[in-house]
């Protein structure tokens, strides 16, 4: 031993503790770490009756490298290695002893100690302050109890723990008391065992020790790297094991236990990477089966604080995908009814399409309309799988509110199909919805104009008004038509600026359908629009539009029935006269017609039958 300090510690703690047991036994075990060398000492001491000098003892010390402590699954198995000197041959005591795990002498018999007292001693062992307990047990029971309890201490904690199974008074070295000592003499600091139930975590150890159940100690050793040197983590770990093994009488208790397990894990291992392996083991599907089923587990983990967990530890997304459609929908229904979804639950609700298809929820349209609408409203992907032509008018109307969400409207890809179905089924279309449809898919403009130009159409004035925002799309549609009806003409006249670049650049010919559909019964506004429109070009069609519009406008001027706001629209496109003639609106209009015909290279003969009225034609000829 290279350290004189450690040699002195071994020598000091090998001295007789003056222990005399309940049956006058005088053998006991001591275990403690060395301070400078990497060894943990487990020693057994016998009183040397054969010595003439009082107080002599034999102490057999086993030096176990601290890195090898994890290899010892049961410290009671060390007892068979200790050998009381019965001869004068002491060479065996300086020779390493082979440790054979299965070679222990007998099973421990600790039932006489009782589960409660074993649990209380365990709590004292883990205490941060030294504990002195009045010994009530035989020497053998004391040794087996303390060595058995060492099996339930993670190695990193054990490296700083020391015990003595028998001493007359508390023992210390270098001013430091051993962690746990069973003492035979009463004193102010000596603790009496109460035999009352301890905390659940300690009680679990007490039951395991007394009944020779090594499973819990095996678990502690398996996860000892995650427990480290933290007594708090060990306590939380054991509490989780207690909860997992609790027998629940009903679903309410199962739910409570599940919440306690999750909360205990969070408190014990608050960081995501703390206890990572243990968390994954706890969250295995077997836990869910025992505590309310997989859907209930996934619902619970979607509503609690999950800042201490990762989805990988829970296998969250994999387990969602492994649910049957019925199971997932049941879970989803629960998620929709709670207000305390965490980020996992919110993501699940927002990404429903990853777990079910539209075909799998289509039947809900008949069986649970509200639930169906809720699913669709939370999933753009499923919304995009809808065949809108299958929807009734009422179903469409109840779905439209979801488009008030800008993100949902942006993600929707089938505006034209929806818009067409709404038109065909005569679903009222608000201007806001029309604006969204036109802005997200310009082909909806074409769809609306096609519908409006059909025989069985029903005008939607709010929709028509929105078309003024899309003159290019309207003009493009018109360029592909040979004829239009009155309602389309109304849209053109009231929505399209006749002098916009899109109108001018597409040429005059595309406006012939508007010219052709006008009759004497049509509003004068249509003719004024056509009149103004003709000023965009100097070609044949422009003169045709001019001629068509001139006569109805002129007739109203002759009768002084053209309202001023309408005259205001055409006056800039009439001839400017001398101030003493400028009051004559009819003359101003006729002069402009004549001027345009002259500019186009037409002869005076073009005015002979320019209008159906002979008098008007004569006036025109005079203006030439």
What is each of the regions a protein language model found here?
Residues 207-624:
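Alpha-helical structural signal with a strong bias for long, charge-/Ser/Thr/Gly-rich
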Residues 1-102, 120, 141, 157-163, ...:
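Extended, helix-rich scaffolding/adaptor regions
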Residues 1-12, 58-67, 72-194, 199-246, ...:
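Soluble, amphipathic alpha-helical scaffold/repeat regions
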């Amino acid at each position: 031993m290279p350290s004189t300090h450690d040699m002195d510690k071994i020598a000091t703690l090998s001295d007789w503790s003056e222990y005399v047991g309940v049956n006058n036994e005088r053998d006991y075990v001591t275990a403690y770490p060395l301070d400078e060398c990497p060894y943990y000492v487990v020693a057994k001491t016998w009183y040397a009756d054969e010595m003439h000098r009082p107080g002599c003892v034999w102490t057999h010390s086993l030096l176990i490298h601290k890195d090898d402590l994890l290899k010892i699954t049961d410290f009671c198995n060390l007892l068979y290695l200790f050998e009381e000197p019965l001869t004068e041959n002491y060479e065996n005591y300086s020779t390493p002893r082979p440790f054979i795990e299965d070679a222990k002498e007998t099973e421990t018999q600790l039932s006489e100690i009782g589960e409660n007292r074993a649990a209380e001693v365990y709590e004292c062992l883990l205490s941060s302050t030294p504990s002195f307990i009045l010994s009530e047990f035989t020497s053998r029971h004391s040794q087996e109890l303390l060595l058995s309890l060492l099996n339930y201490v993670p190695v990193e904690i054990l490296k700083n723990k020391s015990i003595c199974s028998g001493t007359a008074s508390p023992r210390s070295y270098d001013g430091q008391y051993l962690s746990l000592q069973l003492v035979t003499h009463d004193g102010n600091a000596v603790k009496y065992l109460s035999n009352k139930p301890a905390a659940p975590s300690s009680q679990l150890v007490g039951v395991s020790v007394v009944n020779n159940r090594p499973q819990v100690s095996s678990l502690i050793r398996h996860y000892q790297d995650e427990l480290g040197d933290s007594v708090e983590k060990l306590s939380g770990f054991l509490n989780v094991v207690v909860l997992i093994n609790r027998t629940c009488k009903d679903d309410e208790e199962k739910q409570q236990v599940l919440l306690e397990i999750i909360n205990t894990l969070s408190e014990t291992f608050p960081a995501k990477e703390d206890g990572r392996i243990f968390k994954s083991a706890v969250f295995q599907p077997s836990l869910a089966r025992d505590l309310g089923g997989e859907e209930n587990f996934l619902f619970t983990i979607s509503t609690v604080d999950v800042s201490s967990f990762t989805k990988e530890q829970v296998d969250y997304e994999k387990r969602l995908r492994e649910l049957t459609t019925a199971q997932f929908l049941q879970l989803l229904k629960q998620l929709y009814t709670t207000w305390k979804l965490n980020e996992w639950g919110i993501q699940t609700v927002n990404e429903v399409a990853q777990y079910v298809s539209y075909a799998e929820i289509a039947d809900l349209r008949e069986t649970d309309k509200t639930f169906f609408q809720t699913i669709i409203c939370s999933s753009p992907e499923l919304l995009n799988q809808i065949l809108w032509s299958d929807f009734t008018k009422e179903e469409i109307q109840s779905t439209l509110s979801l488009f008030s969400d800008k993100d949902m409207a942006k993600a929707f890809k089938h505006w034209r199909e929806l818009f067409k179905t709404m038109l065909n089924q005569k679903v009222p279309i608000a201007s806001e919805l029309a604006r969204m449809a036109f802005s997200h898919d310009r082909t909806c403009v074409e769809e609306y104009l096609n519908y409006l130009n059909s025989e069985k159409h029903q005008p939607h004035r709010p929709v028509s008004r929105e078309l003024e925002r899309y003159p290019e799309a309207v003009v493009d549609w018109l360029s592909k038509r040979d004829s239009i009806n009155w309602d389309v003409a109304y849209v053109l006249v009231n929505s399209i600026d006749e002098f916009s670049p899109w109108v001018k650049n597409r040429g005059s010919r595309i406006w012939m359908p508007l010219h052709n559909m006008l009759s004497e019964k049509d509003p004068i506004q249509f003719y004024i629009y056509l009149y103004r429109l003709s000023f965009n070009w100097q070609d044949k069609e422009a003169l045709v539009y001019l001629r068509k519009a001139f006569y109805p406008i002129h007739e109203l001027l002759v009768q002084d029935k053209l309202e001023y706001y309408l005259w205001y629209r055409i006056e800039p496109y009439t001839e400017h006269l001398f101030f003493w003639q400028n009051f004559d609106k009819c003359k101003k209009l006729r002069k402009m017609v004549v001027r345009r015909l002259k500019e186009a290279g037409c002869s005076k003969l073009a005015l002979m039958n320019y209008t159906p009225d002979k008098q008007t034609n004569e006036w025109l000829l005079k203006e030439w």
